[in-house]
Amino acid sequence: MLYKSGEKRKGLLMSGCLYRIYGVGFSLGFFIALQIICGVCLAWLFFSCFICSNWYFVLFLWDFDLGFVIRSVHICFTSLLYLLLYIHIFKSITLIILFDTHILVWFIGFILFVFIIIIAFIGYVLPCTMMSYWGLTVFSNIIATVPILGIWLCYWIWGSEFINDFTLLKLHVLHVLLPFILLIILILHLFCLHYFMSSDAFCDRFAFYCERLSFCMWFYLRDMFLAFSILLCMMYVIFINWYFVFHEESWVIVDTLKTSDKILPEWFFLYLFGFLKAIPDKFMGLFLMVILLFSLFLFILNCILWFVYCRSSLLWLTYSLILFYSIWMSGFLALYVVLAYPIWMELQYWVLLLFLLIVCRLD
């Protein structure tokens, strides 16, 4: 059925030619649900013991049916979730630049992104290996540099004057509780998306008559096809090469009397870890890391406000896309490349300074 572009629409009506990349959001929700299910199975048998928490995962592989599958899914899907999440964010940024997207949908999505970062970091710490122990020690000491509340937050996280069993127990409770709060925020994100409608290609902007279809089973099947195709590709990683996402140092048993040679974060934390590593001052590194996260939201807010006044300006659309993909994205990827290869570590200060100047200029 055809509707005029300014006509009031009844129910949830979508464009008949949505791109495949729109299905990434559905895949994210699908894999988040699988992560929560596998996480609940792991949480039932978790030992909040400072010494035995790493051996628990080995025991889970040996003594429980399909234990290796549950553990591999929970580990490998974390990297997959972040890969899909970054694709979803960059797709949303492109659509916000090109089309009018409501700010509330983006704001709730930004809160989801922050929650996922917190949940993933707590999950990284819970096995309590040499790497995660010293990673938590360094990060909590950085939090202690925050004025007024820093010392109190550090002691609250530790539960004592040092990291012990109570720390793992507290982090385990947070790691179980926060995903359910994440589900509530995710439902709000979907509600706002359905209420304000999605930015669907060129129909809302350039076409006077655009074909609108009811959100029927066809859209579900197409999204499910993408999700199950990704799941099929992940079967190889889960059953054969699941240690591909692991560092060798992640298997080293924790020893509080020995300092780890290096701290290697997961690849999806690499750009955040770069700020803490490149800035000598702890508080300034933490401050710039927070500014980086909020600069993404401020950049989109800037684009939306400009869009209100430059709605019909093709020059502004071209300028925004070139600005984002050639400068913002190049700085983001440069941080990854420089921090991933130690041979280029001497360049990290210059790349970090250039990226911060660009972000401040865009905002």
From Swiss-Prot:
GO terms for molecular function: metal ion binding; ubiquinol-cytochrome-c reductase activity. PANTHER family: CYTOCHROME B. The keyword Iron applies. This is Cytochrome b. The gene is MT-CYB. Binds 2 heme b groups non-covalently. The chain crosses the membrane at residues 24-44, 68-90, 105-125, 171-191, 219-239, 287-307, 321-341, 342-362. Belongs to the cytochrome b family. It comes from the Eukaryota. Its main location: mitochondrion. Its cofactor is heme b. Heme b b562 binds at residues 74, 175. GO terms for biological process: mitochondrial electron transport, ubiquinol to cytochrome c. Heme b b566 binds at residues 88, 189. It comes from Trypanosoma brucei brucei. The keyword Ribonucleoprotein does not apply. Component of the ubiquinol-cytochrome c reductase complex (complex III or cytochrome b-c1 complex) that is part of the mitochondrial respiratory chain. The b-c1 complex mediates electron transfer from ubiquinol to cytochrome c. Contributes to the generation of a proton gradient across the mitochondrial membrane that is then used for ATP synthesis. One of its GO terms (cellular component) is mitochondrial inner membrane. A ubiquinone binds at residue 194. It is found in: Mitochondrion inner membrane.
